[in-house]
Structure formats: C-alpha cells, structure tokens
Amino acid sequence: MRPIHPGEILREEFLVPLGMTAHALSQAIHVPATRVNDIVNRKRGVTADTALRLARYFGNSPEFWLNLQAAHDLRAAEREAAVRIEREVSPREAA
C-alpha cells in the first residue's frame, strides 16, 4: 500500500469540503502559494512552521500535521529500505 501523504489529507479532508483552493489557503496562512501547492501535490512535506500555521487556521494541532508527515516518511522508508536493513542489521541478543 502506498504511504498517504499529508497533502492528500489536506486536499481531500480540508480543502475540497470547504471549496477552498490551495492558493486561497496560502493567502490565509501567509505562505507562498508554491508551498501549499507542493504539499497538496505530494512534492513537499509539512514542516513545523507549516504545521503551526495549518493548525492555527483549521483549529487542530500542529502534532496532527507533523504526525501525518512522520507516518508518511516512515512508511516510505520502510518500502524503500526494509529488506536492505533486515539484511544489514541483526537484532541485539538478550543478555
């Protein structure tokens, strides 16, 4: 299964239901339009600064946005490197 990017959540759970464009959101949270567009299009992750702004605007927490990003990053890393890491790293034996 493909990792869900926070931009997909932003678009499908927030922007679409509100009938809001990425450009309108960028103006509302005072960031460049490219930042929001890149997040919505899965080209950029959510930073702490953006998480604070989104949380303030939508009335949720910055942790909500950062947790989405961390979960996405971890799933992506697992898909990319899990087999290699299993080959390279042995579990520590119990004492």
Question: Each PLM stretch: what is its role?
Answer:
Residues 17, 28, 57:
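Residues within the alpha-helical elements of helix-turn-helix
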Residues 21-27, 54:
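Short alpha-helical "recognition helix" segments of helix-turn-helix
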